[in-house]
Amino acid sequence: EKQSKKIAKHIIISVPVWDYYKPKKELALKAYQVLKEVKADSGLIIFHPFRYHKDSDMWYYAPHFHVIGFGWVENVVETYQKYGYIIKNLGKRETLFGTIYYQLSHCGIKKHNHSLVYFGDCSYSKLIVEEEEQESKKCPHCKEYLQELECNTNYNLKPDPNIMEPWYMAKS
């Protein structure tokens, strides 16, 4: 099923305190597992190591993930009871660009780590890039298709550079 038929949702996955000591890679693997359980099977994920405390105007360590996910978010209570990860479905956003832009504006950045990672059907391994057909070049005067010529440098002739630049000639 194409992802374009599903509605993108903003989901937050908060890591339980007992997993705070784990490296980001382990936390991300668990987050993907949690996403599968709640049926958010593809999208993008952004890691945030800190949260902002308004009253103290300070950032504190509280790792969590922001997800723009496709699929139905269900089994949240059961998944929480199983893993301890809190899943918040913030639903459809007014603008995906604005949501992603804001989340990237204060995400965790670390050398050799991507700030934004695609997963599921949105992952790079599932991306199919179709080659574009090149537009055929036609002669501006006779409208015939042009054919490529090989340049023979054995002659000392100096042709007009305007003619030789593209090295094309109409088929006869």
For each feature predicted by the language model, list its residue ranges:
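Right-hand nucleic-acid polymerase module
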Residues: 1-61, 70-172
